[in-house]
Amino acid sequence: MQSFETLEKLLGYSFKNQELLIEALSHPSLRQHHEYKYDKDYERLEFLGDAVLNLVVTEILFRNFASYNEGNLAKIRSYLVCKETICVVGTKLTLKDYIIMTYGEEVAGGRDNPNNIENAMEALIAAIYLDSNIETTRNIIGKLWEEFIKIQNLTDYDPKTALQEWAQASSHHLPIYRLIKREGAAHSSTFTVLVKVKDYEQTGTGHSIKEAEKNAARDLLHRLQDV
């Protein structure tokens, strides 16, 4: 297990109360085995962290997406606080290396379990909030989620770049575009392009290949917000 000091450097935050940090990283399996002598785990902090993350993300979207209506804001928030996004953030922090768990949980694959990474990440947010204040927590979440929020800003006017950044942020291969159909006369052709990222595919049409690629990327990004 790595030292907590390394994790704190990655977060850009040093805990005043180390007990909060330990609690945020303690898997529930520890309480089920008395030989480990842990009387707390991250479940209560996870509950609070989920609410804090939703509040902070909602506020960030409200301030930065003034032209978006309630429905669009809700879709973006769902994407930013979904399990996959939280897991990506936790993975970038190498959070799995810091979770304290029983030997049995570890050999069962618990360190790589996305649920454990998500839960610990939410608990860590709550621990930061309790150890500091909402402003500090807002700044840390803003930094950790920055690339995902940036993607939302790019989606409408530069969806190809937004999709590429989403792929990179999610540790996937870069998008692959393929022309699959061309219809109509030479001066008024309609092009259909297929874009693929990991297991996700989407088609888009346009009066040029560039336009078709842009539409495919935008539609795929909108789909990914609902995943």
From Swiss-Prot:
Domain named RNase III: residues: 4-133
Q: Return the GO cellular component terms, semicolon-separated.
A: cytoplasm
**Which InterPro entries does its entry note?**
dsRBD_dom (IPR014720), RNase_III (IPR011907), RNase_III_dom (IPR000999), RNase_III_sf (IPR036389)
Q: Which Gene3D superfamilies match?
A: 3.30.160.20, Ribonuclease III domain
The top EC class, named as a word, is hydrolase
Please classify the protein's predominant subcellular localization into one broad category: cytoplasm
Q: Which SUPFAM superfamilies match?
A: dsRNA-binding domain-like, RNase III domain-like
Matches recorded under NCBIfam families: RNaseIII
- Name of this chain's protein: Ribonuclease 3
Its gene name is: rnc
